[in-house]
Amino acid sequence: MSYQHSSFDCTSANFEKAALSHFRTLVAFLPDNCRVYRQTWEFSTVLCLDFLACLEGLAITRQNCAHLVNVTQELGLGQAIILKVGNKIIEWHRLS
């Protein structure tokens, strides 16, 4: 039996987009122009938060890092979180 879901697209890219959107709603202090994406590093997936376009949001995000870790783990978005400004890594948090 074949099921067709015309109301939504079940691709991994769309699933990731929805998960990152949900992440943003749960982390309300994150600036809108902070770039949020996932990257593969060897055998791990890392959640990257790039503050190049919103340096003012980095301080409040660093203060709320425990919340970032909890939400990232809850949604299964990665094994680590990187806070960065462009290509420069500011903080790296490995999730347990």
For every predicted segment, state its role:
Residues L55-Q79:
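Short, non-transmembrane amphipathic alpha-helical segments
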Residues T45-L52:
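Short, aliphatic-rich beta-strand segments
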Residues A28-V36:
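Short amphipathic beta-strand starts and helix->beta connectors
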Residues M1-V27, Q39-E42, Q73, I81-H93:
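N-terminal presequence-like segments and adjacent domain-start helices
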Residues L52-C54, G86:
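Short, loop-centered acidic/histidine patches that primarily coordinate divalent metals
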